[in-house]
């Protein structure tokens, strides 16, 4: 499965490391979704410069040259790497096209603290799942969570294009999601529980 979930602060294994500051362009053959949890950094993406700080979301398309120009000492990011093959395997070309449009028109955006926490919880869950033994159910669960993660990015970016204050604009779906996630975390369910529900 062409997906990896990692960060730059916990020592998680990385299959594409772009965190060093050396002024040299890096290029990944996959989509990178980056969420800034702390600190700030300046990214050079092709010929444009983007600055992100806590609560900012950044999408970098596959085969796009970029590098980190500078970052603060407390710069923490969550990263999701999604290979193009995942979109074809999950039969979700609509999501792929929406992401391509957003990357071209609005690759970065600020999100509310509630959304930031939601993304971090999804990221943490996926990081654990990717360490589990791979099978049909695990892969299905990961696929669906990745789609939620990326569709939510589309939702946020679409919503805030015309919203006067994006950090105050919340939807009922977000509240419902938090309630469900909190319930699952409190009961500490195992992978087998999810598999039995699907199967």
Map each language-model feature to its residues.
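Histidine-centered metal-chelating micro-motifs
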Residues: 58, 62-68, 86-87
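A hydrophobic/aromatic-rich effector-binding and dimerization subdomain
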Residues: 2-5, 69-132
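A short, compositionally biased micro-patch
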Residues: 36-38, 61, 71
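Generic protein-terminus/edge-of-domain signal
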Residues: 1-53
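Generic alpha-helical secondary structure signal
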Residues: 95, 117-122, 148, 172, ...
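Short, Lys/Arg-enriched, Trp-marked, Pro/Gly-tolerant hinge/linker segments that flank
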Residues: 110-112, 133-141, 153-198
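Tight coil/turn sites that cap or link beta-strands
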Residues: 19, 54-55, 63, 83
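Amphipathic, well-ordered alpha-helical segments in soluble domains
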Residues: 32-35, 118-125, 145, 149-152
């Amino acid at each position: 499965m062409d997906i990896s979930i990692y960060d730059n602060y916990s020592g998680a294994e990385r299959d594409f490391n772009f965190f060093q500051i050396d002024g040299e362009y890096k290029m990944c053959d996959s989509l990178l979704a980056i969420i800034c949890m702390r600190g700030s950094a300046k990214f050079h993406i092709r010929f444009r410069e983007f600055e992100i700080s806590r609560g900012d979301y950044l999408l970098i398309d596959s085969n796009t040259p970029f590098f980190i120009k500078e970052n603060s000492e407390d710069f923490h990011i969550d990263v999701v790497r999604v290979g193009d093959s995942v979109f074809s395997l999950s039969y979700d070309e609509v999501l792929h096209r929406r992401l391509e449009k957003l990357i071209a028109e609005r690759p970065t955006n600020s999100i509310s603290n509630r959304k930031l926490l939601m993304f971090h919880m999804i990221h943490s869950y996926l990081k654990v799942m990717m360490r589990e033994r791979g099978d049909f159910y695990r892969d299905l669960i990961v696929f669906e969570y990745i789609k939620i993660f990326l569709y939510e990015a589309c939702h946020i970016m679409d919503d805030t294009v015309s919203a006067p204050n994006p950090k105050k604009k919340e939807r009922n779906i977000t509240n419902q999601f938090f309630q469900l996630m909190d319930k699952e975390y409190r009961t500490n369910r195992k992978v087998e529980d999810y598999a039995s529900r699907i199967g």
